[in-house]
Amino acid sequence: MKETFDHAYLEEHMRLNHFRNHYELTRKNLMVKNLKRLRRQLEKESGKLEAQKCDFFPSTYELPSEYHIFVDEYRRNPGSIWIMKPIAKSQGKGIFLFKRLKDITDWKKGTEYQPASDPSKEAPETYVVSRYIENPYLIGGRKFDIRIYCLITSYSPLKVWIYRNGFARFSNTRFSLESIDDNYVHLTNVAIQKTAPDYDPERGCKWSTQQLRKYLTARHGQEKTDQLFNKMNEVFILCIS
């Protein structure tokens, strides 16, 4: 324990629940940076086919530092939809979708982007911008994401435990690209969905992992459902390796 972790500020009764540099996983921009680095490493050492294992997330850039790189990619895909997220916020705060570069120009004029002329002032808030998935898999016509918890007990050797009781979070409103500014359609954060005018607190907007697997098995069969969850486990390993 003492050889592996920083312990200068730990008292006798304290226990650790974070590894050193855990933010390399929990900060959105650092996670993307590390996955891009892993992809380059795999391509160099094992070839393009092996590197394709990292192609599970859409094109993503850090703003403002990669703004000009993003603009080049945006112009290569006219009419596409993108999603902006602050790197260190939760509950859907600060997230928005856009289709026109002008919307980013307006954002740049906001206080979040303004560079600090005074070194004593805080630096502009960092965002990630990702290509929005315009044809997501829907259940009941609604978007959802899956929240799975992993307990990492060791990195050398790597030991990871997957918590079985994860859950899927659903949007409250049926999916449509007609109104990309409607967070009740496009975001699955419970903090946002529970404020929807027609939100039903008894029904909620969550399924357990077991409910999700049962639905997918009934819809697509046991083999394909098992393949999906095995692929998810592979993604977990890539993210933490």
Where are these predicted regions, by residue range?
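Conserved N-proximal alpha/beta basic substrate-recognition cap immediately N-terminal to
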Residues: M1-I83, I87-S90, L97-G110
